[in-house]
Amino acid sequence: MNVLPCSINTLKGLYDISGVEVGQHFYWQIGGFQVHAQVLITSWVVIAILLGSATIAVRNPQTIPTDGQNFFEYVLEFIRDLSKTQIGEEYGPWVPFIGTMFLFIFVSNWSGALLPRKIIQLPHGELAAPTNDINTTVALALPTSMAYFYAGFTKKGLSYFGKYIQPTPILLPINILEDFTKPLSLSFRLFGNILADELVVVVLVSLVPSVVPIPVMFLGLFTSGIQALIFATLAAAYIGESMEGHH
């Protein structure tokens, strides 16, 4: 008796899944370049949130911290401890860089789950986390690579490049390849995890739009935070390694 309605509902769910857009982008033409508009829009929202939060945090500091000031001080202390653990005693100049990377990635990852996707109607695609676009993750990984090259070169000068022939010159190609694979691993790890998380949530919402996707969304928020921590930890570890020597 209920076979037909169930079949119709199943087909409707499959149809909704087939409508999930993967790799669809809304482009802006800027000069001779095409840029992903939805990535820029969400990135601007993330930057506005971070700048607004930072402004509020330093606007009226109290000797006895309020709840909000306590929170921001805890975040700063967490980033400082992370940088010191991975870089060592010379961590100070790198705290702003590591903190910026961590906070931008953290808020970007969460924006994909917390910002309503349909809040702004786009001709193509939907609003999503900036970090589910490979262009964003590569743009985050490349400054990290330049940072650890800069850290090693400023600390050791030309002798920094001696690490490529340690412990034996035979390993020169492998040591060079290792440095080139670091930004690749950083960018593809972050991109793959965030994209997969958002696709899983979209598919589950299409199939069972009520209760089932909620635990997956909470799991996605947790893993999004972990991915930001992993990226920042590895960035700090690479900088610390370049300053200490090849291991």
UniProtKB/Swiss-Prot annotation:
Q: Which UniProt keywords apply?
A: ATP synthesis, CF(0), Chloroplast, Hydrogen ion transport, Ion transport, Membrane, Plastid, Thylakoid, Transmembrane, Transmembrane helix, Transport
Which residue pairs form cystines in this protein?
A: none
Spell out the SUPFAM superfamilies in the cross-references. F1F0 ATP synthase subunit A
A Pfam family it matches: ATP-synt_A
Q: Where in the cell is it found?
A: Plastid, Chloroplast thylakoid membrane
Any one Gene Ontology molecular-function term assigned to this protein's record: proton-transporting ATP synthase activity, rotational mechanism
Recorded superkingdom:
Eukaryota
Which CDD domains does UniProt cross-reference here?
Answer: ATP-synt_Fo_a_6
UniProt GO cellular component terms = chloroplast thylakoid membrane; plasma membrane; proton-transporting ATP synthase complex
InterPro entries noted in UniProt: ATP_syn_F0_a_bact/chloroplast (IPR045082), ATP_synth_F0_asu (IPR000568), ATP_synth_F0_asu_AS (IPR023011), F0_ATP_A_sf (IPR035908)
Q: Which family does it belong to?
A: Belongs to the ATPase A chain family.
* Protein role: Key component of the proton channel; it plays a direct role in the translocation of protons across the membrane.
Output this protein's name: ATP synthase subunit a, chloroplastic
Gene encoding the protein: atpI
